[in-house]
Amino acid sequence: MSYLVTIIAFIIVFGVLVTVHEYGHMFFAKRAGIMCPEFAIGMGPKIFSFRKNETLYTIRLLPVGGYVRMAGDGLEEPPVEPGMNVKIKLNEENEITHIILDDHHKFQQIEAIEVKKCDFKDDLFIEGITAYDNERHHFKIARKSFFVENGSLVQIAPRDRQFAHKKPWPKFLTLFAGPLFNFILALVLFIGLAYYQGTPTSTVEQVADKYPAQQAGLQKGDKIVQIGKYKISEFDDVDKALDKVKDNKTTVKFERDGKTKSVELTPKKTERKLTKVSSETKYVLGFQPASERTLFKPIVYGFESFLKGSTLIFTAVVGMLASIFTGGFSFDMLNGPVGIYHNVDSVVKAGIISLIGYTALLSVNLGIMNLIPIPALDGGRILFVIYEAIFRKPVNKKAETTIIAIGAIFMVVIMILVTWNDIRRYFL
């Protein structure tokens, strides 16, 4: 049963993170007028799909990512060229609404035509010899029209609906929106947790066994007002003061029953693991703070938690990238789907609150990792847009696509190595 719970939790966490990320791309793409033929969660064979307006929404078998397919985002060429024989369906204005490429269709009242000239981006037309009269005709293509192949519809995208022909600013927003929506999701989750749990205060709720707070006699209800020379008004002040005092003997002042008292104690040094190869040193008194529920404090605390988590993850990512050049890199620094599954298994056992917190941190991590300037990632593609904005011309499309393809192959190789490393460490 525990395996089933972990699998369900993993699918939900993965699905939420990828859906939010890809929806960010699609939201800004559609606002910019870019056609999005497909919105996919997962990779590989399609297991479920439905169409809404011009977008096909699909869920695919392998939980290793997702994508939004945008018109003009690659070197794809129209499937029709001069010399081909196709069938066309016309509307009442004698405009082409469907270009049928095979016999796997149910359309009636269609015309067969041998294509002589065609344009699917600017002038939108097909010119050719029709079978019914063996004469040459010129047909305009309707603004909303489709290629039909194997029973599937692919909408034709005019030039002004293609990603490649948009200005740098909407391109940048479309690419940056994926990570941005991950950051927004994390922020919402942190704020939601703060509202649910309350914001921590400097009042003691519970002391931990064999920690300085218990050994010094602190009790439930004691309100800490000073550590060393540092005044305390909220729980964050406790952490800041202890970071400065470290594990040196210090005086702690607290209020109990309306009276101010003081004790001397030595904070305990602890190590908190951030990643598989890095950790953070913390100094603690060993007490659980009481929480309070107010209207606005959870928003502030949620922002602070988001900034702290983002800073820690950003520092870890920068350290990982630096280690590539300093010789300290290890695949243990990275987590693939198998590693994330293992982490979810551990977090689920701690409860739903821990799972939500982990999801928030994972969302931040996904956003930051996608901004790394590797061609296949959002960060690498943003570099191409910055180049276009500076030099007032886009990178050669063939060169850009080749570089992105190389980056994609690199990422696939890395993913395979990381996945094997995770399997070896966790299951072998």
From Swiss-Prot:
It comes from Staphylococcus aureus (strain MSSA476). Zn(2+) binds at residues 21, 25. One of its GO terms (molecular function) is metalloendopeptidase activity. It is a multi-pass membrane protein. Belongs to the peptidase M50B family. CDD domains: cpPDZ_EcRseP-like, S2P-M50_PDZ_RseP-like. It is found in: Cell membrane. The active site is at residue 22. One of its GO terms (cellular component) is plasma membrane. It is an enzyme of class 3 (hydrolase). Its cofactor is Zn(2+). It comes from the Bacteria. The chain crosses the membrane at residues 172-194, 309-331, 352-374, 401-420. Its EC number is 3.4.24.-. One of its GO terms (biological process) is proteolysis. This is Putative zinc metalloprotease SAS1196. Its main location: membrane. The keyword Transmembrane helix applies.
